[in-house]
């Protein structure tokens, strides 16, 4: 196998999960020579704005995809939730490896549980999906926008006026943070995860047969089926980070997949949610999106997308 160059964002988390995936490849073939090329994306450069207000899709992947087209790198290791549902022609997701915990972690000062926070308590999150779901269940709380890496957010919780923050559990675990700092993991009934949360997507050129063969050895088809249902739903609903959208699929023991999709208004007042069970992940994602559209969820998305365009 030729020497491989892996493209990664330069955040600590991105580099850590890239290295963890490289270790997985080297476990399959210890002779592999692999180097990481750090790439700065548009999303990394925007630190003073809420991502949902920036607009566009693929804020954390476009520059990396360009390097694949330019043959500067051989593969890209993405957090799958950052990857738009349509992959550009000429590129492919060569593998979906094992998935980390897909849920969100709730971390509060003095470990006060979410349902015991006093009225007006401030929760920090950078995600419309998290904010909307929290407000729908706890309208007495306040959501305040927070950006930055894990260390920065934990520091802000300590020294600023946040009473709690909510982060993806996967990032905390990949970075080696112990469960001790987490007040609780929020299961899907409290906070439905983002599409593809906890999963990685390994992107490469569609015609790179040698690399695709290697990647197939660390591919997890069960996880791929789940995220396919989730990403089909995202695509069918024309979802983006301007929209509070969630989706989570699990494999059932009988070989079927259960998928729940969710669309909300950012203020948490309107909630459209539906669950389907079936064998074909694409059909599942499309079926749930059809039901939510019939219920009127698409009007929320259209309105938010139009507001973004102006």
Curated annotation (Swiss-Prot):
GO terms for cellular component: cytoplasm. GO terms for biological process: protoporphyrinogen IX biosynthetic process. The keyword Transferase applies. Its EC number is 2.5.1.61. Binds 1 dipyrromethane group covalently. InterPro entries: HemC, Porphobilin_deaminase_cofac_BS, Porphobilin_deaminase_N, Porphobilinogen_deaminase_C, Porphobilinogen_deaminase_C_sf. Belongs to the HMBS family. This is Porphobilinogen deaminase. It comes from Staphylococcus haemolyticus (strain JCSC1435). The lineage of its organism: Bacteria, Bacillati, Bacillota, Bacilli, Bacillales.
């Amino acid at each position: 196998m030729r020497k491989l160059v892996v493209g990664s964002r330069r955040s600590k988390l991105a580099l850590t999960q890239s290295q963890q995936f490289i270790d997985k490849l080297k476990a399959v073939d210890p002779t592999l020579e692999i180097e990481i090329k750090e790439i700065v994306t548009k999303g990394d450069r925007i630190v003073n704005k809420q991502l949902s207000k920036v607009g566009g899709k693929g804020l954390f992947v476009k520059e990396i995809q360009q390097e694949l087209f330019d043959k500067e790198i051989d593969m890209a290791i993405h957090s799958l939730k950052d990857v738009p549902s349509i992959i550009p022609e000429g590129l492919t997701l060569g593998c979906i490896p094992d998935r980390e915990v897909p849920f969100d972690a709730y971390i509060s000062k003095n470990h006060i549980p979410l349902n015991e926070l006093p009225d007006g308590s401030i929760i920090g999150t950078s995600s419309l999906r998290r904010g909307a779901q929290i407000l729908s269940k706890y309208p007495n709380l306040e959501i305040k926008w927070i950006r930055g890496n894990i260390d920065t957010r934990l520091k802000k919780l300590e020294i600023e006026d946040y009473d709690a923050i909510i982060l993806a559990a996967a990032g905390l675990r990949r970075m080696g943070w112990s469960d001790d700092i987490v007040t609780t993991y929020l299961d899907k009934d409290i906070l439905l995860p983002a599409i593809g949360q906890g999963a990685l997507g390994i992107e490469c050129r569609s015609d790179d047969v040698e690399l695709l063969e290697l990647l197939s050895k660390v591919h997890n088809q069960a996880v791929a089926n789940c995220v396919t249902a989730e990403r089909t739903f995202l695509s069918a609903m024309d979802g983006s980070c301007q929209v509070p959208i969630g989706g989570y699929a699990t494999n059932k023991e009988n070989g079927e997949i259960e998928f729940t999709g969710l669309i909300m208004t950012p203020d948490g007042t309107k909630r459209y949610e539906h669950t389907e069970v079936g064998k074909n992940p694409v059909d599942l994602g499309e079926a749930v999106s059809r039901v939510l559209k019939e219920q009127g969820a698409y009007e929320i998305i259209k309105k938010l997308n139009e507001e973004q365009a102006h």
